[in-house]
């Protein structure tokens, strides 16, 4: 959740397992358009195709769509240019899920403050990510390419 990409920086395998690393939050807390790329996934099926959300948006590095299924992404094209912002080929993943060996891994950049955690949609998303990680629900994590 949120700050997990900042943990265990001296342990490369942790970053590999998680699927990415923290690389700044150039806009700090801002309202952004979020694209739901996985309306069929248990943790994101309750979100509309595109919705606005306010949070501190973490930028990732060492992330590859070849290894993870992006569930939610920020539409960075709708934001003003910002120093330090460098989406990966225009892509700004926020929530993803993947397999790591026989384990299920999910990450979300959402959840900076209590207001976000008090949001019922975010609570449902995290509950469903946990249930999926435990194998209690099924969800396709086949990687998909970035589509603008």
Language-model segments: what does each one mean?
Residues 5-13, 114-117:
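Short catalytic/ligand-binding loop motif for oxyanion handling, primarily in non-cytosolic enzymes
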């Amino acid at each position: 959740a949120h700050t997990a990409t900042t943990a265990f920086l001296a342990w490369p395998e942790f970053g590999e397992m998680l699927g990415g690393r923290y690389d700044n939050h150039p806009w700090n807390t801002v309202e952004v358009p979020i694209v739901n790329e996985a309306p069929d996934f248990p943790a994101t099926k309750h979100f509309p195709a595109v919705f606005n959300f306010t949070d501190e948006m973490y930028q990732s590095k060492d992330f590859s769509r070849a290894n993870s299924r992006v569930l939610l992404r920020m539409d960075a094209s709708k934001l003003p240019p910002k120093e330090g912002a460098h989406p990966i080929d225009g892509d700004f993943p926020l929530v993803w899920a993947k397999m790591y060996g026989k384990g299920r891994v999910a990450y979300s950049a959402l959840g900076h403050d209590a207001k976000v955690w008090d949001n019922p949609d975010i609570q449902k998303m995290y509950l469903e990510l946990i249930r999926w990680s435990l194998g209690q629900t099924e969800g396709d994590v086949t990687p998909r390419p970035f589509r603008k």
